A protein has these predicted regions:
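NAD(P)H-binding glycine-rich loop region in Rossmannoid oxidoreductase-like domains
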Residues: 44-92
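N-terminal Rossmann NAD(P)H-binding glycine-rich loop of SDR-like oxidoreductase domains
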Residues: 3-23
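Catalytic helix-loop patch of NAD(P)-dependent Rossmann-fold dehydrogenases
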Residues: 88, 125-164
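NAD(P)-dependent short-chain dehydrogenase/reductase
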Residues: 153-156, 161-164, 168-199, 241
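Mid/C-terminal beta-alpha module of Rossmann-like enzyme folds, strongest
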Residues: 2, 217-265, 298-301
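Conserved Rossmann-fold NAD(P)-dependent oxidoreductase catalytic core, especially the SDR/UDP-sugar
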Residues: 95-138
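Alpha-helical substrate-binding/gating segment
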Residues: 182-190, 198-231
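C-terminal amphipathic/interface module of NAD(P)-dependent oxidoreductases
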Residues: 268-302
Length: 302
């Protein structure tokens, strides 16, 4: 299969490219840096600039599927300008791809798989939400998810299947939230956040890239929660990390107002509680390699 990937050099993209190449697929990837363009037989780069509406049209030649991972990092301080970048880096890129595919009706693209977020779901500790949930949260990130998904849904009018993976906290040693949680615990200053009771729906990086591959092979359509079967509290996550690192957590929980002073509105990421179901993807036969938090953290840090 020939697959076009946006965000191929990001945390998830890097690992996904490795897996897809190992399975014999050919990768086309889009980059905003002309000096990062490679042209190997099975890994070919193409220039684009979504802000300026520029894209090398050859990128979709003989492509069977698109995987859309591009998007500015949400773990940075949310100034008004950066909020706009968070939205546009996801939506303008999808719109540029849509217009390109629409311009070439003889394309052979059958599916687009897009990253998405769990922020769209209501806050919850006890109630478990699944993909049929109509109620949504009223927050900046929830609105990002709505605009993000709307920007890829338009591919349906071209007869292309649209699969959206609403991704929880991605556990990886190479980036994302986990290394930031590990740092203070390693130094002996770790603590749970707020009440510590907020639920974190998470997924190991290996399971996430396997899920993208599963969605590709099964040519999935619709929304799926990319989270493991066992959501946990922030307190349990903190204690599990400490146990694996052979450290203890002795400090009192960090109050929410302190983190708001330090991080601003972005502190939402630490205190948000999303209790989500993975049943929809399980019912299709997907199997998690790391369903339990202890095994996931041990795999990454032992």
């Amino acid at each position: 299969m020939r697959i076009l990937i946006t965000g191929a050099t990001g945390l998830v993209g890097n690992e996904l490219v490795k897996l897809l190449l190992a399975k014999g697929h050919t990768i086309h990837y889009l980059t905003t840096s002309k000096d990062k363009i490679e042209a190997e037989s099975n890994y070919i780069g193409f220039f684009w600039n979504p802000q300026e509406g520029k894209i090398d049209e050859n990128c979709i030649f003989e492509v069977d599927a698109i995987i859309h991972l591009a998007g500015a990092n949400i773990a940075k301080r949310w100034t008004n300008a950066y909020k706009q970048e968070i939205i546009e880096s996801r939506t303008l890129s999808a719109e540029l791809l849509f217009n390109l595919v629409k311009k070439h009706p003889n394309h052979q693209i059958k599916q687009i798989i897009s990253a998405s977020g769990t922020a769209i779901y209501p806050e919850s500790i006890d109630e478990i939400y699944d993909e049929t949930t109509k109620e949504t949260e009223d927050s900046f990130l929830s609105n990002v998810v709505k605009k993000w998904e709307a920007s890829v849904n338009v591919f349906q009018v071209l007869g292309i299947k649209v699969c959206k993976l609403r991704t929880g906290i991605v556990l990886s040693k190479k980036g994302g939230a986990l290394p930031e949680m590990v740092k203070p615990i390693k130094l002996g200053f770790g603590s749970a956040m707020g009440s510590g009771k907020q639920i974190q729906s998470w997924i190991h990086i290996n399971d996430l890239v396997a899920l993208y591959n599963f969605a590709l092979e099964k040519r999935l359509d619709g929304v799926y929660n990319a989270v493991t079967t066992n959501p946990i509290s922030n307190e349990v996550l903190s204690k599990t990390i400490a146990k694996t690192l052979k450290k203890s957590i002795w400090l009192p929980n960090t109050p929410e107002f302190v983190m708001k002073l330090i991080l601003g509105e972005m502190s939402y990421l630490l205190f948000s509680s999303k209790n989500l179901s993975a049943n929809k993807i399980l019912d299709l036969g997907f199997q998690f390699q790391f369903p339990d938090i202890e095994k996931a953290i041990d795999d990454l840090y032992q």
